[in-house]
Amino acid sequence: RFEKVPDENDLALIQRIEGGRIPYWYPTDELPDGEKMSDPRNAGVTHVHQFYTKRNLWVLSKVFDTIDSNENNLLKFLFSSMVNRATRMNRIHINNYFHGGGGCNAGYLKGTLYISSIPIETSIIEQVKDRIIWFNRAIKRMLFLHQRPLISTNSSNKSLVPSNSIDYIFTDPPFGGNLMYS
């Protein structure tokens, strides 16, 4: 593994990013009150944009600005599928970091807003590449399906689904207070 000690150019770049004003829109909403909001507040996060490093927030806001101006819902879908992996909530995978094998990004802790004391910053460019690869694989797999999957959220007594045509039903179980839905 290669480790680089930051030189004067690196430090100047960091200072320029941290001191600069991001010229693109990004959300700055205050976090709402809630049962699980003490975790981010304990880490100094009181507003949505504080979940991101300044560098990642800058790049994400530029990417979103470009996508939003094109009004392309597919690109917005891909963007929304990667923003959670760009936050300060990403944790380091200690075993992989020190001993190799897989990536050192363990991702975020699902179902929480926990910010690790040792967060890991991910490259937005790598995230975009990953999402494009993921999406292409998903499209290829869908092309092999003989029948299109059907999702129905209407009343069961007004169903348009023919009898004996359902292979699988997924229901979202109630988790009580374990997961916050709002």
Where would I find each of the regions flagged by the language model?
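Metal-dependent catalytic core segments for phosphate chemistry
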Residues: 168-182
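Nucleic-acid modification enzymes, centered on SAM-dependent nucleic-acid methyltransferases
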Residues: 1-162, 180-182
